[in-house]
Amino acid sequence: KATQGANGRWSFTPAGDWADGQYTLTVKVEDEAGNIRQSAPLTVTVDTQTAIDGIELVNDHGISGDNLTNALRPEFRVTTPGDVNTVRLSLDGDTNWVNATKNAAGVWEYNWPGDVGEGKHTLTVEATDAAGNTATRTLEFTIDTTLSVPVITLDSADDSGNRGDNVTSVRSPGFTIENIDPDANRVTVQIAHDGSSREVELTQTGGRWHFTPDSAWTDGSYTLTVKVEDNAGNIRYSTPLDVKVDTHTSINRIELVNDNGVPDDNLTNEMRPQFRVTVPEDVTVVRLSLDGSGDWVNATAGATKGEWNYSWSSDVGEGKHVLTVEVTDAAGNTATKTLDFRIDTRLSEPVITLNSADDTGVPGDGLTSRAQPSFTLQGIDADVVRVTVSVEHGGRTETFDVLQGAGGWIFTPAAAWTDGSYTLKVTVEDEAGNIRHSAPLDVKVDTQTAIDRIELVNDSG
């Protein structure tokens, strides 16, 4: 019931506190004559409080909702009741407040215009509604832009070639990953090989980060890159590591360079043999041993890649020998191959004689009346591969190849010789390239004689 004051005004005050909400008030008046009138209804809203429903770090990178970001200029979103008309923010107790802006969806937003330093921060948000009520709420957040660059290396035990060359003969090599920060939440290794790539997620074991392929790699080149991500969403990549897997090597060829005589028969008349070894270009060491002696000598790389040479520094004896070659490549792989060869420096000196049947003069005087005399060749070794007879006559020399017949080594001119002097010499060559010459044989062909004159000595008349 309303009451009239001393000034004649009527007023109404509730006897008790009203709860928040909407109220409709209507005034009813009645005079002494019994007339009654009612006012138009008055709707009143009682609003004694407001709230801040949520504060969100918009650029919360990494793990969602952990209020950890790597953005130096954080962005915030504030959710409030619809009747809030002012939202302002303050950082780390600063008395300088900034006003958020309400978007079309009724959410308040603010992007910090300047860089906020690394570390922990406290955001204070104050909201004011249409009734003048205020509410305050804080948000703890952290800015972290720091993450170390990881490093990946081939395990020294698997670096089987020259130390640090990242060439290995191990098909499942191990790799050590270092410089991983404690707040890293994901570590992966990206492996590129032969035009394709894959990513493997790692787990820290025994306080260390390590990677070993789960299956054997084929020979070839591999590029490994470590990717690290922390709780704040920072990402770092290691410098790519190029690794070559090489699990075998070979010896392509062993050549006896001074192979005289028949080519490639590995027979020589040189007491100091020379060898050429052809190998893959990644071979770094070539060594040789003779007849299983266990004494090794190192070959020297030639001007042509993949060719190695060695000339024996002292005489090697006559006969058969076995050369053993061992090679080692950059990955530490080894290969062994042998070459059987023979040294032969001996060859008998041939002898040529005029056949006795054609020695028509005094035996052994080298004088014959035969225009096509035959000659016997002796002292011809079994390993001889070529026999020639050179015939010099009248300032001209001709050479003829001789073949062994059923009757032995015989040389007979193919055409009749004219009368005159002839010098014959035999040359023999064996499989090892040894050459010997006979002593010259001088022969005179005289196929006719004459009676120049008959004289009666005691012709006295």
Residue ranges and their predicted role:
Residues 8-12, 106-110, 207-211, 306-310, ...:
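Short strand-edge motifs at loop-to-beta-strand transitions and within beta-strands
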Residues 15-22, 112-120, 213-221, 312-320, ...:
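Surface-exposed, short loops/turns at beta-strand junctions within beta-sandwich domains
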Residues 37-60, 137-155, 237-259, 337-355, ...:
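Flexible, low-complexity linkers/stalks enriched in Thr/Pro that connect modular domains
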Residues 62-72, 160-171, 261-271, 360-371, ...:
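Short, solvent-exposed loop/linker segments at the N-terminal edge
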Residues 74-80, 173-179, 273-279, 373-379:
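Aromatic/hydrophobic beta-strand junction motif of beta-rich domains
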Residues 80-85, 179-185, 279-284, 380-385:
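Short proline/glycine-enriched turn/loop motifs at strand-loop junctions of beta-rich domains
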